[in-house]
Amino acid sequence: MNLNSIPAFQDNYIWVLTNDEGRCVIVDPGEAAPVLKAIAEHKWMPEAIFLTHHHHDHVGGVKELLQHFPQMTVYGPAETQDKGATHLVGDGDTIRVLGEKFTLFATPGHTLGHVCYFSHPYLFCGDTLFSGGCGRLFEGTPSQMYQSLMKINSLPDDTLICSAHEYTLANIKFALSILPHDSFINEYYRKVKELRVKKQMTLPVILKNERKINLFLRTEDIDLINEINKETILQQPEARFAWLRSKKDTF
């Protein structure tokens, strides 16, 4: 399979996974126009859409795409039923698309019904995990989001994290505000700055590398714990996650 990305809105990525025959699955099409343009340019044959959650910038293009390709199956959690989903999916489900098996797991936090789609090495994680960060808690609790991130963190080292937004630079600036002397984060910051100056995307990222620079995956890291302890003593990693998320919300 081949991974492709389509920029949308200000900072969204619509991921498109294609096979050698040109059949494809489209992930979180927030708008239809750029997808239709890419389909025409590459002569792709859309087979399915994956929806991770109900927010408009992830589902806004579904109904128009279905008008052009009514044969498509649209997979999504229950919260996307009125957004164009034709087949509802949830935690533990497996589906076969493009001849490949995808496993779904619930990742509540950003929204209560958020799901991720995984077919090694590709993880389509919507707004749950970003490079250097994680999604805002619009509906879920810090505990829910922490558990969702731990599910992702348990995946193989070579998992490709296909997040839905280009938030990396801002996330790494936040990480440096907490751990300014961390060598991994500083090195990644320089790399990300260079990419963004050239208008190049920073995604996808490899989970093994993400574990080194994403503070939300490092809640048991001694350097981070020592930094948090300067302000408050938090014994549980979930509590440290909540502290981090609160800091990021006002950064």
Curated annotation (Swiss-Prot):
EC number: 3.1.2.6
Binding annotation for Zn(2+) 1: 53, 55, 110, 127
CDD domains tied to this protein: hydroxyacylglutathione_hydrolase_MBL-fold
UniProt keyword annotations, A-Z: Hydrolase, Metal-binding, Zinc
UniProt cofactor note: Binds 2 Zn(2+) ions per subunit.
Cofactor(s) named in the record: Zn(2+)
A GO molecular-function annotation: hydroxyacylglutathione hydrolase activity
Stored InterPro entries: Clx_II_MBL, Glyoxalase_II_hydrolase, HAGH_C, Hydroxyacylglutathione_Hdrlase, Metallo-B-lactamas, RibonucZ/Hydroxyglut_hydro
One of the protein's GO biological processes: methylglyoxal catabolic process to D-lactate via S-lactoyl-glutathione
Pathway per the UniProt entry: Secondary metabolite metabolism; methylglyoxal degradation; (R)-lactate from methylglyoxal: step 2/2
Residues the entry annotates as binding Zn(2+) 2: 57-58, 127, 165
Membrane-traversing stretches: none
Reactions catalysed according to its record: an S-(2-hydroxyacyl)glutathione + H2O = a 2-hydroxy carboxylate + glutathione + H(+)
Family membership noted in the UniProt record: Belongs to the metallo-beta-lactamase superfamily. Glyoxalase II family.
Record text on subunit structure and interactions: Monomer.
PANTHER family associated with the record: HYDROXYACYLGLUTATHIONE HYDROLASE, HYDROXYACYLGLUTATHIONE HYDROLASE GLOB
Functional description taken from the UniProt entry: Thiolesterase that catalyzes the hydrolysis of S-D-lactoyl-glutathione to form glutathione and D-lactic acid.
Annotated protein name in UniProt: Hydroxyacylglutathione hydrolase
